[in-house]
């Protein structure tokens, strides 16, 4: 397995992309790049600076002054904003409910995509997001589009919130996830959509292990060519 390929995993909010991507990256000894965490970090920085997240010009001032770095922690990936560990604070509901608004801005996405492509240029990466297979890594050797029902995704996020000690309301989460789907799918710039050459994977009734096995099977097929 000397060949270092790029693996793109796309899908809607709470489809399990990050969880699966981390495991796949670990199995292959690849770098995992969580593009969602990059947008979350920008969102967190903007909220901290009391910036109007609907205002692209103000947001770009934030983006210009933000350095985002990833480091591998013991069991997780750590995210740093200008040297400060923000791994936990970028996962709060306040950030989660606003990240799609920040991500819809053309100039913000262009800059983030540029940074993501830079991180992935040597291959050996697993990258997850909304537009990886269509826009960020259109030449990725493996493209997966993960799906799951709104109900299933809300339940996963609810459990995640409870485990982290956040207040969580299942019905409210269903509404918020449906709203994020709408925002992500309908935005003008790089909307959430399946790449023509991506393999669709419905994870509604599958465990993480089963999803990982399916993806590793696809990767093995690429290595065998």
Curated annotation (Swiss-Prot):
The UniProt record lists the keyword Nucleotide-binding: yes
This enzyme's EC code(s): 2.7.4.25
Highest taxon, organism lineage: Bacteria
UniProt keyword list: ATP-binding, Cytoplasm, Kinase, Nucleotide-binding, Transferase
InterPro entries: Cytidylate_kin, Cytidylate_kinase_dom, P-loop_NTPase
Record's catalysed reaction(s): CMP + ATP = CDP + ADP; dCMP + ATP = dCDP + ADP
Family the entry assigns: Belongs to the cytidylate kinase family. Type 1 subfamily.
Protein name: Cytidylate kinase
């Amino acid at each position: 397995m000397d060949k270092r390929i790029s693996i793109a995993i796309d899908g809607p909010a709470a489809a399990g992309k990050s969880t699966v991507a981390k495991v796949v990256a670990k199995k292959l000894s690849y770098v995992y790049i969580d593009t969602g965490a990059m947008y979350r970090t920008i969102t967190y920085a903007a909220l901290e600076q009391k910036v109007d997240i609907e205002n692209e010009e103000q947001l770009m001032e934030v983006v210009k002054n933000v350095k985002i770095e990833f480091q591998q922690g013991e069991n997780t990936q750590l995210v740093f904003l200008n040297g400060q560990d923000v791994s936990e604070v970028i996962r709060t509901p306040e950030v989660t409910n606003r990240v799609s608004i920040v991500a819809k801005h053309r100039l913000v996405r262009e800059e983030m995509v540029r940074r993501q492509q830079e991180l992935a240029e040597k291959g050996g990466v697993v990258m997850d997001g909304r537009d990886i297979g269509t826009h960020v890594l259109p030449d990725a050797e493996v493209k997966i589009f993960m799906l799951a029902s709104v109900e299933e995704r809300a339940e996963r996020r609810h459990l995640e919130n409870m485990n982290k000690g956040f207040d969580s309301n299942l019905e409210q989460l269903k509404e918020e996830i449906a709203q994020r789907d709408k925002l992500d799918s309908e935005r003008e710039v790089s909307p959430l959509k399946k790449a023509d050459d991506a393999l669709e994977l419905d994870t509604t009734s599958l465990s993480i292990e089963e999803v990982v096995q399916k993806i590793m099977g696809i990767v093995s097929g690429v290595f065998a060519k």
